[in-house]
């Protein structure tokens, strides 16, 4: 199979690479099939590219790379929807908002994506009673930046 992504160019994939989101993703409910593509080896960032819509590509990340204590409580209903028999089958990602200055990127910690890597089913879980935000900065300012309000100049 093949799709020409607006962001990523031509992508070839097999049907077993497709992750199905039976309920879609809020704001993209009509989109049900996606590809999870690593941005590079050893980095926590991924593309979540629609398998049908070349213009729909989200940037997602492993939340634990930025928020080691991040946790959500997944109920039995969600586990059943994912055809999950063991929690070890699950992968967790958060959708990022990436502005022009990548250092200002934020993560939606309220509504992570949960993917069963065995069944290839996914859903967006909406956490209730959470202290998390939908725009949590993933890069923390350095102590000097916090004290002065001035970011360090980029080298190069």
Curated annotation (Swiss-Prot):
Compartment annotation: Cytoplasm
One GO location term (cellular component): cytoplasm
GO biological-process terms attached to the record: bacterial-type flagellum assembly; regulation of translation
Signal peptide: none
Keyword tags: Bacterial flagellum biogenesis, Chaperone, Cytoplasm, Translation regulation
Record-linked InterPro entries: Flagellar_assembly_factor_FliW, Flagellar_assmbl_FliW_dom_sf
Family: Belongs to the FliW family.
Protein name: Flagellar assembly factor FliW
Natural source organism: Syntrophomonas wolfei subsp. wolfei (strain DSM 2245B / Goettingen)
UniProt lineage: Bacteria, Bacillati, Bacillota, Clostridia, Eubacteriales
